[in-house]
């Protein structure tokens, strides 16, 4: 079958897991699977987002894989450059360490760590201007969904960042991850039909914001597992996955990446 012109992304968000020794073992297991049955980069981009103190270690481990696997930062500072910002890591410091991908806007950071829209815009602006590719997360709560506000909330979250993203950055440096908050870490997931429906609305909204809207990868991030990956991958506006718990198991993560790669073959 002929695949979409958008190459899928499958990114493992490890969150505050695991210990560094276990992380190295996890990467080695994943590399072994790729060696046994490679997943071509022309069919699927793959990345992992480890804890900050393991970024360069994991990057070094991945450098010996038989294909490029991106190392993704889980967050970036709202402050640029260097300076007296205790505990912060700027986009410039990440790129200086050859980390060129970053998650911004994850619901856990919004809800637990106070990342409101102005902070997110600052993080996004600095990351984009430093040349990073940003996986920008949007999503609604269960209460918002039950009130029929899911589409409105998600589209507003995208419109909020539009002023700090240039036309060229939309085209080359933005990936959108839709993560229904009510499905994260709960084992619940939207049906493929529901996920496709809101992804289609996101696509429609992006096309109103930027001419690049039809070519921006849209990832689904609500409890993606090998058991539902094939159905999700078959949806025309789901161009990959932001994977949480399942990415902590090398075989599960590999199967999810394989499911999306097969849509391009």
Curated annotation (Swiss-Prot):
One of its GO terms (cellular component) is cytosol. Substrate binds at residues 13-15, 185, 223, 244-245. Pfam families: TIM. GO terms for molecular function: triose-phosphate isomerase activity. Its EC number is 5.3.1.1. It comes from the Bacteria. Keywords: Cytoplasm, Gluconeogenesis, Glycolysis, Isomerase. Pathway: Carbohydrate biosynthesis; gluconeogenesis; Carbohydrate degradation; glycolysis; D-glyceraldehyde 3-phosphate from glycerone phosphate: step 1/1. It catalyses: D-glyceraldehyde 3-phosphate = dihydroxyacetone phosphate. It is found in: Cytoplasm. GO terms for biological process: gluconeogenesis; glyceraldehyde-3-phosphate biosynthetic process; glycerol catabolic process; glycolytic process. It is an enzyme of class 5 (isomerase). The keyword Oxidoreductase does not apply. Its main location: cytoplasm. The active site is at residues 106, 179. Involved in the gluconeogenesis. Catalyzes stereospecifically the conversion of dihydroxyacetone phosphate (DHAP) to D-glyceraldehyde-3-phosphate (G3P). Homodimer. Belongs to the triosephosphate isomerase family. This is Triosephosphate isomerase. It comes from Acinetobacter baylyi (strain ATCC 33305 / BD413 / ADP1). The gene is tpiA.
